[in-house]
């Protein structure tokens, strides 16, 4: 028997079937960095319109986790897709390098500054530790396939950046937004430092809930307000609190001016309570019998005085709109040193901002003998005993409630008034301007706008000073007596910045004030505080983007971080940019959700559900991780597990197999010599290129709107359905059996070439390693890397005006689908083996029949049968199957006549009719020894 294998155009490519990504990707990375791929991209994009995605700096501490991977991959997808859109989109990764977590790590290694090591030695150790952490994280980020200027990242501890952070503060001071005050701020006892809003987390805590009686200083005056001048007993205003330890700092009691208050008598004692809360207070105090003596508005109680239960002084009743009837008594214990609302109202009444608590959370000496030196949370019971002894405790119980905790230590924090520096939200209109700027930013998803608007509207002044060692100094000089800033503050800060630019932040602590103050050094001293680390990262639009040459002075277009950054980096950046320049630092803000396991649970080592990006890359490869990120809707929680990653790996294989089929069938094709013009191409091939054109339009639009999961879905639909289930199946016969250099085959290869040119670009932002691998196997002259290209512009489609247009092929897809159902049933019934053993008759209504006859004797190629006949619908016999999915069509199937051709596998009746080739069919004889068959449609 003659072997006709050498007469077939069998697929052949060096592109492997298996990705082996975990093994192959590291070698590709090595090549990328040896050849300076990022530099090549920058050179290719030079002079194009810019798109700047500014990297929010991760903290330089610890290994990267799956959330870091999501963040960096999303950024990389955007950067690469913007490049394909024709943008110059430089990416400069950064790290946040100052702050408490690094201090704590270094303390564990070498001890606290001022003990075993000097502050200068401690800072040097912090800098060294942060640099080590950056290098470790950098390797993992690079392994993800993220392209950027990894050789020159920005670090907030770079000398020039530290100097620019000081300059940013100088600009804010020049614009009048800084002030100093002894305001209550979030204070962590363990950190011994103020905390930013973004460093506070809320957890449930059980606290003592107490009702306390403040006895009236002038009973007659108070009783008269309620029309009960004859009442002779003691009268007390009852407050409610869950922080008994703050009572030593009480300086007033706030009531609402518009609420009704009642004076009620209980066993000869008079209690003042909000009328709406009398029943609930009496119920929890176990009091069943009382008499209402009179009522008065809260406004009538203003400035009446009441005795502190154990501190030996009296305090006024004051009016406050913040008082509510949600819980308590309607009278609010007011300690201006321990609460923001208390502080604000205290300023209105000129109250003392008392702060009897030290930085360690213990009462200062001289507070009260029973409390001096006691830690505040341990003092609650002592305070309650003091209240019992004075007869002022009406009721006590345990209450579980949400309470602020330190994000680092997970321990309860306190409000504590200390002299701090603040960026004011209102003294120069920063809040109002920020709210206006928010409206000009595109927030993705849209709910982000309302979220940050609420935060800005309600946030207090920003405490930017910290009492830490490892941080950027505030670089301020204040008067020894008045604490006023030096009149040449801006000039002096620039002088300090220049020194820091040369020698780093240590230059500030080494600075002798006389060097720049001259004679004024006798009257001014250096402020020892450092800046909140959120000021470091929040000023990078100025300290980094505005000065890096690759950004060419352009402002950032996009910030992209996790949804927790509305109150973190997005907020601090907005505050600083608006305070400096009167405008937001970004045009778009995109947020992604947190990663959870397959059951929607937060990842936890104790639960054992943590997915390590390093392990995923070592097992499956970075492209699988990248494909998972892209295919997940990032606007909500992002679920990841072994099973979910397995599904991503399956999707990857389908896309890879499509690419491999295209490459294998482009064997021997040179686009410069073999391309067929659209007018000469087989109609089905033009249709396939048109489907790629339609897919590309949707994919590019999805990339542009950052809908990456829709990119993946459309790519999968194109590869699996439009190509894999239809076109690629149909063309195998023509591709393999026609003459190698025939129009029929070259038309098909031309289509495959256009499709792979488009597909590799669609893949590049997401499956970057695989796209680069494909690029290396594609025919024709091309640039070194796909990453320097733009979207493929060589696609074209069918003319909608011609009969065999897209709509026509959609009908044919339906006919093929219905035919496949009949064939599958026949195979199940053992009537045939494969579809080429079948001969089908399509009984169709007149319009459909006319459409099917357009393909002439090429119709059967679309159905993958050996023969297909179109007949009138009315002539269908009982053996014809009515199609459910396509009305007006019945299909009858019979076994194909003739013998199986060993070359094309079709069943034909003309085998043996050619003396030189007696074993093959007439069509194959034409392709082997004759002029070759012609194809017009299929």
From Swiss-Prot:
Enzyme class: ligase
UniProt remark on cofactor binding: Binds 1 zinc ion per subunit.
Main localization of the protein described in the UniProt heading: cytoplasm
UniProt keyword annotation of Acetylation present: no
Pfam families xref list: Anticodon_1, tRNA-synt_1, zf-FPG_IleRS
Reaction catalysis annotation: tRNA(Ile) + L-isoleucine + ATP = L-isoleucyl-tRNA(Ile) + AMP + diphosphate
Enzyme Commission code: 6.1.1.5
Molecular functions per Gene Ontology: aminoacyl-tRNA deacylase activity; ATP binding; isoleucine-tRNA ligase activity; tRNA binding; zinc ion binding
Entry's Gene Ontology cellular component terms: cytosol
Ligand binding (Zn(2+)): 901, 904, 921, 924
Requisite cofactors: Zn(2+)
Annotated residues for binding of ATP: 605
SUPFAM superfamilies: Anticodon-binding domain of a subclass of class I aminoacyl-tRNA synthetases (SSF47323), Nucleotidylyl transferase (SSF52374), ValRS/IleRS/LeuRS editing domain (SSF50677)
Residues engaged in binding L-isoleucyl-5'-AMP: 561
InterPro entries linked: aa-tRNA-synth_I_CS (IPR001412), aa-tRNA-synth_Ia (IPR002300), Anticodon_Ile_BEm (IPR033708), Ile-tRNA-ligase (IPR002301), Ile-tRNA-ligase_type1 (IPR023585), Ile-tRNA_ligase (IPR050081), M/V/L/I-tRNA-synth_anticd-bd (IPR013155), Rossmann-like_a/b/a_fold (IPR014729)
Ranges spanned by the short sequence motif 'HIGH' region, renumbered to the chain: 58-68
BP GO terms, sorted: isoleucyl-tRNA aminoacylation
Keywords: Aminoacyl-tRNA synthetase, ATP-binding, Cytoplasm, Ligase, Metal-binding, Nucleotide-binding, Protein biosynthesis, Zinc
Cell location: Cytoplasm
Chain location of the short sequence motif 'KMSKS' region per the record: 602-606
Oligomeric form and interacting partners: Monomer.
Domain remarks in the Swiss-Prot or TrEMBL record: IleRS has two distinct active sites: one for aminoacylation and one for editing. The misactivated valine is translocated from the active site to the editing site, which sterically excludes the correctly activated isoleucine. The single editing site contains two valyl binding pockets, one specific for each substrate (Val-AMP or Val-tRNA(Ile)).
Family: Belongs to the class-I aminoacyl-tRNA synthetase family. IleS type 1 subfamily.
Entry function: Catalyzes the attachment of isoleucine to tRNA(Ile). As IleRS can inadvertently accommodate and process structurally similar amino acids such as valine, to avoid such errors it has two additional distinct tRNA(Ile)-dependent editing activities. One activity is designated as 'pretransfer' editing and involves the hydrolysis of activated Val-AMP. The other activity is designated 'posttransfer' editing and involves deacylation of mischarged Val-tRNA(Ile).
Protein known as: Isoleucine--tRNA ligase
Organism: Sodalis glossinidius (strain morsitans)
